[in-house]
């Protein structure tokens, strides 16, 4: 971004005004970085002072096609001129078109639209219960599936769960991640589903052992429990395929999606196979599958296809991990990931890396205390990756 995109007015005064208003009016639930961002393009964002940052957070793995991709922007603008919202009491052409598109890229027959990742997990849990007539769940330790009450029932981290106990589902059993036998032992006659992230995101970019998910699939088939994959963070090219399930050759019964689905526009969805359906009136969403969201999502899918971002995610991810592994540091435990979903485990809390990188014009964040999460837009360049690695090597 070479153009001057700073709004008029003194930047310091504008910064102070934002911080003051946020402190006064917004519930202070977020541990924010001391940045007020104003614009973004591709893999770069700009703050109100005009400083640019290579963005390896990407709205938390949302901006896969890059910030403000012109195809997505134009699609939203065009749709906004015709129809913004009508609710699901009526049909719209664009929702039907995106439903067909989503069924095609997921390889699943039925979809339901919502607005966020947590909503998609809630919908998946409800669907599992209604499809099986059972109520219990098996989930993994270090899992993260959302902060709404239902999703918290299958989210492991006590910091998120404990203030809101008891959970909606008190019948959730947590087992070690990547331990299929533990899942077998945990499934009961009342288990509706096993819910897993194919790669754990918030838990530390944890990749399961080879064969783990296939074995879980076999166990679910044997016991009659459904298998839910939470692909909220791993979907839409993040790991180098449309969905991470393709990396492991395993097909879930239900899949939750959000984050990158709308190219930065809020949207969520679940997909399921025939025979696993809600009945009329069993679930609903006022805004789910709205015209603007579907326009953005169709545009996002188009960009991923036309710009070959699945292949680019693999290529840039391999390049990024090779460069990271070559850093001259003695405090890096491991570099791991798939595609452009990368974790760098450090021997100690990684907060200082986040602060140093920000000061040097790179945005990263920690997932778990000691793992740096790098999830840049899939359009990131090798030159930008080189800059990021140079900064992290100096931290």
From Swiss-Prot:
Gene for this chain: argD
Note on how the cofactor is bound: Binds 1 pyridoxal phosphate per subunit.
Similarity remark: Belongs to the class-III pyridoxal-phosphate-dependent aminotransferase family. ArgD subfamily.
Coiled-coil positions: none
Residue positions binding pyridoxal 5'-phosphate: 117-118, 144, 230-233, 286
Keyword Secreted: no
Protein name: Acetylornithine aminotransferase
Keywords from the named record: Amino-acid biosynthesis, Aminotransferase, Arginine biosynthesis, Cytoplasm, Pyridoxal phosphate, Transferase
CDD domains per record: OAT_like (cd00610)
Additional information: May also have succinyldiaminopimelate aminotransferase activity, thus carrying out the corresponding step in lysine biosynthesis.
